[in-house]
Amino acid sequence: MNTEASQDKTVSMTTGERLRQAREQLGLSQQAVAERLCLKMSTVRDIEEDNLSADLASTFVRGYIRSYAKLVRLPEDELLPMLAKQAPLKVAKVAPMQSFSLGKRRKKRDGWLMSFTWLIVFVVVGLTGAWWWQNHKAQQEEIVTMADQSSAQLSQNNEGQSVPLTDSNADNSAPLADNGSTPVDTGVAPQQSQTPAVSGSATAQQPAVVSPSQTTLPETTPAAPTAPLPTADAGVTAPAVDPNALVMEFSADCWLQVSDANGKTLYSGSQKSGGKLSLAGTAPYKLTIGAPAAVQIQYQGKPVDLSRFVKSNRVARLTVAAQ
């Protein structure tokens, strides 16, 4: 009778109660069990009170109970079937609510995270677009300003060059008038010298009339063709032999400004596609180019590298000097 009563009592006990009873029979405390099983004391307490968390996987629960049973010398075959009967009831009551709340919190957290991520993306895109627009606008304003300055300089240069042009024309017209009047005077002078010669002695005046005509004709004829030839040849060949010439070829319309070491503006204006420009001055040259991709520059037979300006798509400001 006592045996049957003890068996009924054992069957009615839960897994945690049987483990606690076996621990007390061996005289072990919960702290000692926790240290031997490398578990927290709260976990040992939850196992004995059958109050394991629903978040804990069943594999870990079975492992804890199996280790606890070996420690207190209880057969595992008796405890695990009892655990299978107890666990579904608790899990069925608690797990759905906890999983629902966890899923809801996770979705809420993911929603905030996605919103924050999209906000950062929009801010980065907006700042990038604003930065690009400011640079583009600044470049356009700079090109317009340089074009206005070049047009103003060209108008000033044209006004300054108008006076020398009129002076040169006046100077050119003056020698022409003198050259035209000289043969007239020489032609009249012999006639005036001949009239008194007829009234006097004709024989004495004849050599004087012939000698001026013979002496003036050789002087005037060679002077006209020989004088302009050296100046014309020198004006054509002088720029071609300048070693400091700056040669530029244009593949598209481009605005540029070039000045030499003395601060003299050699060129300021626009060039069309297919144009070629050769400038000579005192090195180093200072260049400002509105469209670096549209021009190829050679100096002393070597190309000038403009790739850094082409890649950044900005106005080129550089100094070209002898290497």
UniProtKB/Swiss-Prot annotation:
Residue intervals on the Cytoplasmic side: 1-111
PANTHER family: CYTOSKELETON PROTEIN RODZ, PTHR34475
SMART domains cross-referenced by the UniProt entry: HTH_XRE
Entry GO CC: plasma membrane
Domain notes: The helix-turn-helix (HTH) motif in the cytoplasmic domain of the N-terminus is involved in the formation of spirals to maintain the rigid rod shape. As this protein is anchored in the cytoplasmic membrane, the HTH motif may contribute to protein-protein interactions to form the RodZ helix, which is localized beneath the cytoplasmic membrane. The C-terminal domain may be critical for determination of the rod shape by probably interacting with enzymes required for synthesis of the peptidoglycan layer, including PBPs in the periplasm.
Stated role: Cytoskeletal protein that is involved in cell-shape control through regulation of the length of the long axis.
Gene Ontology molecular function, alphabetical: DNA binding
Ranges where the HTH cro/C1-type domain occurs: 19-71
InterPro entries: Bact_Cytoskel_RodZ, Cro/C1-type_HTH, Lambda_DNA-bd_dom_sf, RodZ, RodZ-like_C
Listed Low complexity bias regions: 215-234
GO biological process, alphabetically ordered: regulation of cell shape
Name recorded for this polypeptide: Cytoskeleton protein RodZ
UniProt topology in membrane: Single-pass type II membrane protein
Stretches with biased composition (Polar residues): 149-172, 179-214
HAMAP family given in the database record: RodZ
Sequence intervals crossing the membrane: 112-132
